[in-house]
């Protein structure tokens, strides 16, 4: 089975569109997402366009703040502070990567935790690991949603996550653990990686190496989630999984493009609604 992330994300966005109309009726305004981009990185610009397009589709207020490549860290932090203090703003996202002279850690920590739609703020990360209510990072959240929508059972299953990044590998392993999977985190130093992966009922590839996961890594019938986005020399987008080789072996697989990518943006929209509702709730209680 091919898990069609494009189709699933579209149906979720359609549902959110209706939800946003109801929220506007109830609260007198729509969720508002501010996206900040620094410089002219073409890949970043493409991602940002996709995010703004999704806000428009779902009926949010989505605004782009464009800052020059030579923008100082202080100027960026001042802009974040302005948005933190703006009651009309529900979500703030700074598109990564940033120019070398700006500290990503400082920028992520500067965004108010309650407006952190990426789920990267240290407070949200801590709350995830402490099993407390938090904004979840978009890609891991999207992966769980894809598995659920495809009817893949998680509880009691063996899951292997290849990759230990703070953005995907570690948080998705925690979400799988929370759903009662038995989780192994594998990485570049794992001995006999293929044998470890062959144990998995659910295999998540998030290493950033084109077509690294071949058929010998996959247990017949396993669900394979490909998080990788790699560009070949010919300019073609491919994942971390050798899709054509693994497709006949896997029970379910996400393609690249059209798998995890669309879900990441859709979960960003979901997180913006959550930030809006959290803020409206605390405003009502106050």
Where do the model's predicted regions map?
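Short beta-strand segments enriched in small/hydrophobic residues
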Residues: 31-39
